[in-house]
Structures are given as structure tokens and as C-alpha cells.
Amino acid sequence: MAKRQLPVHKNEQRDITITDLTYEGMGVAKVDGYPLFIANALPGETARIHVMKVGKKFGFAKVIERYQDSEERVPLRDEDGLRTGTMALQHMTYDAQLSFKQKTVQDSLAKFVSLQDVDVKPTLGMSDPWAYRNKAQVPIGQDDQGRLFTGFFRKNSHSLVPITNYQIQLPKIDEMLQTVIQILNEYNLTAYDEQTHQGLIRHLVIRQGYHTDDVMIILVINGDELPHQAAITEAIVAQIPNLASLIVNHNTRRTNVILGQEETLLYGEPYYRDQMLGLDFMISAKSFFQVNTPQAEVLYQQALEVGDIQADDVVIDAYCGIGSISLCLAQRAKHVYGVEVVSDAIEMAQANAKMNNLGNVTFVAGKAEDVIQEWQAAGIEPNVVVVDPPRKGLASTFTDTVIELAPEKIVYVSCNPATLARDMNRLVAAGYHAETVQPVDLFPQTPHVECVTLLMKNR
């Protein structure tokens, strides 16, 4: 069989028109039906491009010259954000970003006949969509003079781009990153090289309480000990205001997972504190806590409102983590049962419930489907189930358990429209219906979007 002749070839230059966007926000141009994906390009724009890579089904190109700009284009704030992929949408007006995210959700649902009539509301955005992240986790490099620097990996590569202003992190976090790097550079420490598995400093993680200003600093090292530990600790404590926790995390594995299993507390407590909707939370190094606090409060408020949580409701919060949604629910419901597979998170959730004087909440560590069946056997009958799963969505065994449980309402908080649509389709087939999905923008300048939807049991 003759090899199919592609309409473009690598290193070719040609003029194109952008007709669409991918779900990652890349521009799409088609040459005789063959799609080219192009960063920093918007629908309606015409440009001269250079073809970078050609595959059987699609290729990648870059813009050499734009002939016509979209009305939805704004000047780039930082080209490094495009090179690294940390701000893939920064060339779009913020209104256009919000519309893009609404359309991403609509397109995901439209792939299923059962969901094509579900109304996707306009995305709830921020008044200022910059400098919002309460958490930084940045790789550390080393320059030709042997000095450490903060950066981020160039997209689809192992090449580290030096960065000091990340644009989307809280400004104090960017300042603290440089302060800590300056301290480390006084002791001639080496940066980890993932190619050779040599060098010490892998990542620097800083978390800051949005409402409290509490700071947690985590030095991730490829080793058992941090040289000059006492002097480095003393310097960081002296120069970082509101330091609540200083930790060395030991990660000696060949992996791109940032945190290792073992950690050593150098100063303070093994947690920092922040607030969410007026509740206090202790947050450990490995605990999940939404990185955009103001928008997380919007997200959780939406979950409470669409679920219409009442004083006689019995609620199960699956994937409950440290209890950030559970405790918000417990302020309204009769009782909340939280389940989470990570036992450390459950210990933190129990401590958070106690700290907030909430006695109507029970936390159990285990697989959600197993624990829910145990609760059923014990006579617990929830009428509301809240889920906030990771990007891979609900495990099929968990979905089976929820269908068997048959709660009146399922409140689904999602960080991935594709798996949300897949899971909604299964639940609709099992006798539920959804009327609306509410997108919320927790990650401005990026293609990521969170959603809240209510699924009601058919009567």
C-alpha cells in the first residue's frame, strides 16, 4: 500500500488562517484537511508559519509573522510563560479566556448524546486574573558560574528556563523564592541533574496562606542530609517573615514526582494555616489545598448552593482530602461523612474539624467505594453525595457504588471536563439528570477549568 503523501513537510513555510483552538488553547490551521497546532495563535488570525514537526495525523508549527491580529489578542506579559506552558492563554483577553473555558466544557459534554441539552453557564472569573497562586513548586538549575537559579522546564523538554517572576504566583512567593536561593548560594550547593541523577537541590516549594500570610518552605533534596543545615535554617528563619514551617523533603528516586516519602522538620510545625469561607485549616506539606483561594471559595460556595444543603441533609464527601469541602458542608448539614484514601489527609481533616468545633463530621481513611458500603451496612443513609476527584475522574467501581447507593443528589466538583462528561454520561444512564454545569476559573492564563454540577435522581 502506497504511503500517504502529507500536504505539509517539516521546515516548510506557508501562509495560513487560524480557524479554531484545541482544548489546550493552541491555534488550529488546516492544510487540505491536515491540522497544524500553533501556539500563540487565535481564530481569525492570518500568519506565516514554520512547520516544526509532522506526524501521521497532525503537525506542529510556529508563527514567523502575523499578518492580522484577532480582536481577542492582548500583548504578552511574559514570553517565558509561553515557552514553558505555564501561561498558555496569556495572549487572549480575559473575557476570551472565560468564553474559551465555557466552550471547552460545552464541547466535552456534546460528545455524549445524553448531555447535549445540559446548559453550561458562563465561566465565573476573577477581577484580577494575575498573581493568584498560593503555592509554588519550582525546579532548581545551576548556571555556568555554579550558582543556583529558579526556573521552569521549556515545554516538552528537559531544558530549564531561568525565571524570577512567575506572574501567576502571589508576589511574596516570588520574592521568597529568590531570598531562599540567595541563602543556598552562600554554601556552594549543587542543583539536581535528572539526566545524571547527580546534584542535591531538586525543587523549592513555597506555600503561603492567602488569608493568614503563614509560610511553609520545603527544600526537596536528592540526599539524606542538607549540608550546613543549621546555618541555612537560621538564615531562612531570620529572612522570611511569618515562617510557620521549614521542611527538608528527601527524594532520591529517579522520578518526576516532586515530593519524596521522607521529610525532616527543621523549624516550626509540620503544617501551616489558612482559611476557606471563614473556616481555619492546617495544611501539611503533602496536603491538597486549592492553589487559588478566592476562586476556590467561589467554587465551594457554588457547590453549597447548587446542592441546596439543608439542616436535615446527611452528606457523604468522597475524595475529601483535609476536609476543605466537608467542613463547609458541615456548617449547613445534619452530618457529613468524609472518606479519603490518604490516611495522613484524614488525620489532618480530623484535626481541622476539631479546630473549628464541628462535631457533626466523621472522617475515615480508605477506598471510597469500600467505606461507603461499610456505612451503608451500618444504616447510614445519605441523601447527598459530593465528589471532587482528581483529573482522572471517578473510578468505575466508585461510580457503581454511588449508583447502588442512589442518593437524591450528587454534587460533582470537577477539574477535568472530559472525565466529568464521561462520568455524567454513566450517571445519566443510571437514572440521574443534570440541568446545568457551572465553570469556575481557578487557573487564569491557563487552559484548566473547574466545574460544579448537580445531578438529581429522576423521580
Give the location of each predicted region.
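Internal alpha/beta scaffold segment
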Residues: 160-202, 223-247
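Short, solvent-exposed loop/turn elements at beta->coil junctions and helix N-caps
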Residues: 121-128, 194, 203, 439-442
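Terminal RNA-binding accessory module
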Residues: 1-81, 363, 370
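Rossmann-like S-adenosyl-L-methionine
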Residues: 2-15, 20-23, 224, 228-459
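Extended interfacial segments that mediate partner engagement and assembly in macromolecular machines
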Residues: 64-76, 83-190
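Short, acidic/hydrophobic/Gly-rich beta-strand patch recurrent on exposed beta strands
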Residues: 27-32, 151-154, 218-220, 349
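Short, aliphatic-rich beta-strand segments
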Residues: 206, 213-222, 280-284
